[in-house]
């Protein structure tokens, strides 16, 4: 018997929730109506261009298949359909254990405009998403108990290994989350793995196959794009990271490409606990803009007033290429790139400019086997290189255009070991690039 795939149409302009939603002439009116629909492989949800879904959200826990993914996108002409969650779409996040830093928050309510919960083989594209404070709720922007918010949250918990998560051409902005809660689903796009209710039955919660591409993310807090924080973090202690650990407990086949992140309150783009993730052709501008005493003023015991641009956390053989980072704001980090507690990170063919914390850091004792080559740094500030307690790093054939008075090694972050070979260092007078 031939499978009948359904397409659900939704229009805030011409729809009615009493319609069947199965044609452009009989669309639903609200996203709430979709929550009554069970989705099957090959099904589609299409929102009409020009529609605005105010105080609404879309939470999905159904899955497609490798051959027939579920698709959520747009139809018609005009502006992308808009989902303005405004603090709705609240769900409870719980890692089921303390995080790698016990001071970090590991459970609590989260508001997500789009939530994929144990859903796989699903493609979301061509939507505009915001998640600000509700007009009926008074929330101080930097309050310690401010609601965690996401544009798009993806969660693995009770479905074992999730495959085929594809996000493309999303415009996500004005997501006013909690700036202090680093590892809650908090920011533009954030994917996490939580402790399963019965891991012996469902298997380890993890991701194998994530593609985030052509997305624009701006004015979000805390993270721009983060993929892969996991309840299994204790499996990844130490400097040498075994491939087998990632195949069983970490993330695989993570590709983040051609995304733009601007004015994230904290970090721009970070794959986490991933084996050979590829992060390429992305741009970040003016991020870490809330890592300052004016905004980050009530952290309590959470600390965490640090952020960098495009970097990995606890990954093995991560590749970063053809990325660009500008104007990172100064904090304890504040550099464009950061090989952080990973094994075998490779940065090549990247560009950085006027980042207040410098070009690149090799962060602490568990940052090993890292290579930084064929990159260009123009007028980065604060100190170009930050070998901070790392045992090794190979820095070769890069071009550094350094403003007079800016040190090659950042002060108080230069006690690690690096090997410098065939780098071109040119002194410049000022930000306009005039040579001395």
Spell out what each predicted region is.
Residues 4-6, 40-44, 68:
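Loop/turn elements at helix/coil->beta-strand transitions in domains of secreted/extracellular proteins
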Residues 6-8, 26, 81:
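Structural signal for short hydrophobic segments within the conserved structured cores
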Residues 12-48, 53-54:
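Acidic Gly/Asp/Thr-rich repetitive segments characteristic of extracellular carbohydrate-active
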Residues 32-38, 53-64, 82-85, 273:
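Short, T/G/N/S-enriched strand-turn elements that build extracellular solenoid repeat scaffolds
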Residues 46, 65-145, 171-182:
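Right-handed parallel beta-helix/beta-spiral solenoid domain characteristic of secreted/periplasmic
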Residues 57-60, 91-115, 138-158, 180-203, ...:
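Extracellular beta-strand/beta-solenoid scaffold signature
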Residues 69, 76-78, 120-131, 160-176, ...:
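Right-handed parallel beta-helix
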Residues 435-436:
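C-terminal accessory segments
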